[in-house]
A protein has these predicted regions:
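N-terminal pre-domains immediately preceding structured catalytic cores
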Residues: 1-130, 137-180
């Protein structure tokens, strides 16, 4: 009986301990659907919060004074990044995502690591300022060339000033939704 009680207590304890962010990447159909819904909501929130403003490649808008836990939503179809603080849309920026041959993965990702200046180990030591890694294969959000269309090897390139500000508000473990 004591062995059974100990086993049950251990199981309950194990379930109550959050998993490491390294194990929290979700690329299931449900996660991809949730990311699409989040992107649809973000698009509508952008119109409500920032009006009909059309951003050109490399541009962003940012509302200071918005507080709360950060959450990032990436829309690959719109080539846009949306930052929420709590339930409020705080910022929007244009992005450049992966190409058809080097696609950006979709789903729900935690920020696994952050580095103010990183260099790619895969692509000719390419600079990746304000790098925020999203998976174990090297996909990250970082400052980079932003032509307004998919042009990366899978990373999410952000306008440099937006990338620096975003880096300042996110934490390892912050959630990033990436929608097709």
């Amino acid at each position: 009986m004591n062995t059974l009680a100990l086993a049950l207590a251990s199981s309950v304890l194990a379930l109550s301990i959050p998993l490491s962010p390294a194990f929290a990447t979700i690329e299931t159909h449900e996660a991809k659907s949730a990311a699409l819904e989040a992107a649809d909501e973000a698009r509508a929130d952008m119109a409500e919060v920032f009006g009909d403003k059309q951003l050109k490649p490399g541009q962003y808008v940012w509302r200071d004074g918005v507080e709360g836990a950060p959450r990032v939503i990436i829309s690959l179809s719109d080539q846009m990044a949306y930052l929420y603080r709590g339930d409020e849309l705080a910022a929007v920026a244009t992005i450049s995502s992966g190409t058809e041959t080097n696609p950006t993965p979709t789903g729900i990702f935690p920020i696994l690591a952050k580095k103010t200046m990183h260099r790619s180990r895969k692509y000719d030591n390419a600079p990746m300022p304000f790098m925020q890694r999203l998976d174990s294969y090297g996909i990250a959000m970082h400052a980079g060339f932003n032509p307004g269309r998919p042009a990366s090897h899978g990373c999410i390139r952000l306008p440099a000033k937006f990338a620096a500000k975003l880096y300042g508000v996110t934490e390892v473990g912050s959630t990033v939704f990436i929608a097709a």
